[in-house]
Curated annotation (Swiss-Prot):
The gene is rplQ. GO terms for molecular function: structural constituent of ribosome. Keywords: Ribonucleoprotein, Ribosomal protein. GO terms for biological process: translation. Belongs to the bacterial ribosomal protein bL17 family. The keyword Ribonucleoprotein applies. GO terms for cellular component: cytosolic large ribosomal subunit. This is Large ribosomal subunit protein bL17. Pfam families: Ribosomal_L17. The keyword Phosphoprotein does not apply. Part of the 50S ribosomal subunit. Contacts protein L32.
Length: 132
């Protein structure tokens, strides 16, 4: 019987699931926008949001906890140096999940996961042509 077991199984064993979400959180912190299936996106919130909350108070102990969960020094650095200060005044809800249709191959529901309040991409300025 499956009583009080929280979380989605996603047809994977526990080590595969753990590695998959570790990679997804790393990609999310690095790129601030990823595309994945809707069930994975909803489950990703359970892994990413506590890490961002942890990064709001910068300490050696918190950095070690984040490194134990992510295993990537550059990602932990960005988490504590950029994302923690960015979300200092926000009490939660750091991710936005936007549905984006269905995948072509198997019609799986897809979604974008992005960090709220991420800076807009900088557009290249037009180059003036020099007419002599």
């Amino acid at each position: 019987m499956r009583h009080r077991h929280s979380g989605r199984q996603l047809n994977r064993n526990s080590s595969h699931r753990k590695a998959m979400f570790k990679n997804m959180v790393t990609s999310l912190v690095e790129h601030e926008l990823i595309k994945t299936t809707l069930p994975k996106a909803k489950e990703l919130r359970r892994y990413a949001e506590p890490l961002i909350t942890l990064s709001k108070s910068d300490s050696v102990a918190n950095r070690r906890l984040a490194f134990a969960r992510l295993g990537n020094k550059a990602t932990v650095g960005k988490l504590f140096n950029e994302l923690g200060p960015r979300y200092e005044g926000r009490p939660g809800g750091y991710l936005r999940i936007m549905k984006c249709g269905f995948r072509a191959g198997d019609k799986a529901p897809m979604a974008y996961v992005e960090l709220v309040d991420r800076p807009a991409p900088v557009a290249a300025e037009p180059v003036e042509s020099s007419e002599d």
